[in-house]
Amino acid sequence: RKFATKRYQTSIKPTLNYTSDFHKEIKSIVSELNLPKSFSCFHIRRGDKVGEKLYTWTQKTGRTESKRFEFCDYLKHCEDIKTIFIMTDDFRCIQEALEYISDNNLPHKILHLTNESQDGHSETLNIQNARSYSREELVQFFAEIEIAKLSDVFVGTRTSNVYKYIMNTCTTNTKFVSLD
Protein backbone atom coordinates (compact mmCIF):
# COMPACT_ATOMS: atom_id res chain seq x y z
CA ARG A 1 0.00 0.00 0.00
CA LYS A 2 1.12 3.50 -0.74
CA PHE A 3 -0.01 6.36 1.44
CA ALA A 4 0.91 9.99 1.51
CA THR A 5 3.23 10.72 4.38
CA LYS A 6 1.80 12.91 7.10
CA ARG A 7 4.52 15.47 6.41
CA TYR A 8 3.54 15.69 2.74
CA GLN A 9 -0.18 15.82 3.55
CA THR A 10 0.54 18.71 5.90
CA SER A 11 2.51 20.57 3.25
CA ILE A 12 -0.05 20.09 0.46
CA LYS A 13 -3.19 20.73 2.52
CA PRO A 14 -2.84 24.54 2.52
CA THR A 15 -2.41 24.49 -1.25
CA LEU A 16 -6.08 23.84 -1.96
CA ASN A 17 -8.89 24.54 0.46
CA TYR A 18 -12.54 24.41 -0.55
CA THR A 19 -14.76 27.35 0.29
CA SER A 20 -17.57 26.39 2.67
CA ASP A 21 -20.20 26.61 -0.11
CA PHE A 22 -18.09 24.53 -2.50
CA HIS A 23 -17.47 21.96 0.24
CA LYS A 24 -21.21 21.77 1.00
CA GLU A 25 -21.93 21.07 -2.67
CA ILE A 26 -19.34 18.29 -2.72
CA LYS A 27 -20.71 16.77 0.50
CA SER A 28 -24.24 16.89 -0.92
CA ILE A 29 -23.22 14.99 -4.06
CA VAL A 30 -21.32 12.38 -2.05
CA SER A 31 -24.25 11.98 0.33
CA GLU A 32 -26.76 11.51 -2.51
CA LEU A 33 -24.76 8.54 -3.83
CA ASN A 34 -25.39 6.57 -0.63
CA LEU A 35 -22.00 4.91 -0.89
CA PRO A 36 -21.71 1.55 0.84
CA LYS A 37 -19.13 1.03 3.55
CA SER A 38 -16.93 -0.93 1.15
CA PHE A 39 -16.38 0.09 -2.47
CA SER A 40 -13.63 0.45 -5.02
CA CYS A 41 -12.91 3.42 -7.25
CA PHE A 42 -11.59 3.20 -10.81
CA HIS A 43 -10.13 6.28 -12.52
CA ILE A 44 -10.53 5.36 -16.19
CA ARG A 45 -8.66 7.59 -18.64
CA ARG A 46 -9.97 8.20 -22.12
CA GLY A 47 -9.78 11.06 -24.60
CA ASP A 48 -6.50 12.56 -25.71
CA LYS A 49 -4.18 10.67 -23.35
CA VAL A 50 -5.03 7.31 -24.93
CA GLY A 51 -5.27 8.55 -28.52
CA GLU A 52 -9.04 8.92 -28.79
CA LYS A 53 -9.06 12.71 -29.06
CA LEU A 54 -6.86 15.33 -30.68
CA TYR A 55 -3.58 15.71 -28.78
CA THR A 56 -0.50 17.61 -29.92
CA TRP A 57 1.86 15.06 -28.30
CA THR A 58 0.35 12.23 -30.35
CA GLN A 59 0.46 14.27 -33.55
CA LYS A 60 4.13 15.15 -33.03
CA THR A 61 5.38 11.75 -31.87
CA GLY A 62 2.86 9.25 -33.23
CA ARG A 63 2.54 7.81 -29.71
CA THR A 64 -0.11 8.20 -27.05
CA GLU A 65 0.82 9.40 -23.60
CA SER A 66 -0.79 6.43 -21.88
CA LYS A 67 -1.91 2.93 -22.69
CA ARG A 68 -5.66 2.39 -22.91
CA PHE A 69 -6.79 0.02 -20.17
CA GLU A 70 -10.15 -1.74 -20.30
CA PHE A 71 -12.66 -2.17 -17.48
CA CYS A 72 -11.58 -5.79 -16.93
CA ASP A 73 -7.98 -4.61 -16.33
CA TYR A 74 -9.24 -2.54 -13.39
CA LEU A 75 -11.69 -5.13 -12.08
CA LYS A 76 -9.14 -7.91 -11.66
CA HIS A 77 -7.47 -5.91 -8.87
CA CYS A 78 -10.53 -5.94 -6.61
CA GLU A 79 -13.11 -8.44 -7.90
CA ASP A 80 -14.34 -9.17 -4.37
CA ILE A 81 -15.61 -5.62 -3.86
CA LYS A 82 -19.03 -5.54 -5.50
CA THR A 83 -19.65 -1.79 -5.67
CA ILE A 84 -17.47 0.25 -8.00
CA PHE A 85 -17.39 4.00 -8.36
CA ILE A 86 -16.02 5.05 -11.76
CA MET A 87 -14.26 8.40 -12.19
CA THR A 88 -14.16 9.36 -15.84
CA ASP A 89 -14.95 12.21 -18.19
CA ASP A 90 -16.17 9.85 -20.92
CA PHE A 91 -19.60 8.26 -20.57
CA ARG A 92 -18.55 5.43 -22.91
CA CYS A 93 -16.47 4.07 -20.00
CA ILE A 94 -19.65 3.69 -17.97
CA GLN A 95 -21.39 1.95 -20.87
CA GLU A 96 -18.42 -0.39 -21.40
CA ALA A 97 -18.36 -1.30 -17.70
CA LEU A 98 -22.10 -2.00 -17.61
CA GLU A 99 -21.84 -4.12 -20.76
CA TYR A 100 -18.91 -6.09 -19.33
CA ILE A 101 -20.81 -6.76 -16.10
CA SER A 102 -23.92 -7.80 -18.02
CA ASP A 103 -22.07 -9.94 -20.58
CA ASN A 104 -20.20 -11.78 -17.82
CA ASN A 105 -23.21 -12.03 -15.49
CA LEU A 106 -21.35 -10.35 -12.62
CA PRO A 107 -23.00 -9.10 -9.40
CA HIS A 108 -21.16 -5.77 -9.41
CA LYS A 109 -22.90 -2.40 -9.11
CA ILE A 110 -21.57 0.70 -10.88
CA LEU A 111 -21.84 4.20 -9.43
CA HIS A 112 -20.71 7.34 -11.24
CA LEU A 113 -21.25 11.06 -11.65
CA THR A 114 -20.50 11.12 -15.38
CA ASN A 115 -23.32 12.34 -17.60
CA GLU A 116 -24.12 11.11 -21.10
CA SER A 117 -22.84 14.27 -22.77
CA GLN A 118 -19.30 13.81 -21.45
CA ASP A 119 -17.14 12.36 -24.23
CA GLY A 120 -13.55 12.58 -23.01
CA HIS A 121 -10.88 15.23 -22.72
CA SER A 122 -8.76 16.91 -25.37
CA GLU A 123 -6.27 19.38 -23.97
CA THR A 124 -5.41 20.60 -27.47
CA LEU A 125 -9.05 21.29 -28.38
CA ASN A 126 -9.67 22.89 -24.99
CA ILE A 127 -6.80 25.32 -25.57
CA GLN A 128 -7.83 26.03 -29.17
CA ASN A 129 -11.40 26.73 -28.09
CA ALA A 130 -10.43 28.61 -24.90
CA ARG A 131 -12.62 26.18 -22.96
CA SER A 132 -13.34 26.94 -19.35
CA TYR A 133 -14.99 24.63 -16.85
CA SER A 134 -18.28 25.50 -15.19
CA ARG A 135 -18.71 25.47 -11.43
CA GLU A 136 -20.91 22.38 -11.82
CA GLU A 137 -18.13 20.55 -13.68
CA LEU A 138 -15.57 21.51 -11.05
CA VAL A 139 -17.83 20.43 -8.20
CA GLN A 140 -18.35 17.09 -9.96
CA PHE A 141 -14.60 16.63 -10.45
CA PHE A 142 -13.72 17.41 -6.84
CA ALA A 143 -16.61 15.28 -5.58
CA GLU A 144 -15.11 12.38 -7.56
CA ILE A 145 -11.75 13.06 -5.91
CA GLU A 146 -13.29 13.03 -2.43
CA ILE A 147 -15.18 9.83 -3.24
CA ALA A 148 -11.92 8.23 -4.41
CA LYS A 149 -10.32 9.04 -1.06
CA LEU A 150 -13.14 7.17 0.70
CA SER A 151 -12.72 3.98 -1.33
CA ASP A 152 -11.12 0.77 -0.08
CA VAL A 153 -9.17 0.37 -3.32
CA PHE A 154 -8.33 3.05 -5.88
CA VAL A 155 -7.27 1.71 -9.28
CA GLY A 156 -5.82 4.07 -11.85
CA THR A 157 -2.61 5.03 -13.61
CA ARG A 158 0.19 6.62 -11.60
CA THR A 159 1.15 8.77 -14.60
CA SER A 160 -2.15 10.60 -14.20
CA ASN A 161 -2.11 13.86 -12.26
CA VAL A 162 -5.46 12.84 -10.77
CA TYR A 163 -3.93 9.62 -9.37
CA LYS A 164 -0.96 11.54 -7.96
CA TYR A 165 -3.16 14.18 -6.35
CA ILE A 166 -5.51 11.66 -4.75
CA MET A 167 -2.64 9.51 -3.46
CA ASN A 168 -0.80 12.51 -2.04
CA THR A 169 -3.82 14.00 -0.27
CA CYS A 170 -5.50 10.80 0.90
CA THR A 171 -5.57 10.37 4.68
CA THR A 172 -7.64 7.17 4.77
CA ASN A 173 -6.47 3.56 4.42
CA THR A 174 -7.23 3.45 0.71
CA LYS A 175 -5.08 0.94 -1.15
CA PHE A 176 -3.64 2.39 -4.38
CA VAL A 177 -3.15 0.19 -7.45
CA SER A 178 -1.52 1.52 -10.61
CA LEU A 179 -2.02 -0.17 -13.96
CA ASP A 180 1.08 1.45 -15.47
PLM-predicted stretches and their roles:
Residues 1-81:
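Secretory-pathway luminal glycosyltransferase catalytic domains
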Residues 43-45, 49, 81-133:
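Catalytic donor nucleotide-activated moiety binding site of glycosyltransferases and closely related
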Residues 52-55, 94-100, 165-168:
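A short acidic (Asp/Glu
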Residues 56-60, 100-103, 171-173:
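Short secondary-structure boundary/capping segments
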Residues 61-64, 131-135:
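Short, flexible loop segments at the rims of nucleotide/cofactor-binding pockets, characterized by
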Residues 80-84, 151-154:
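Short active-site oxyanion
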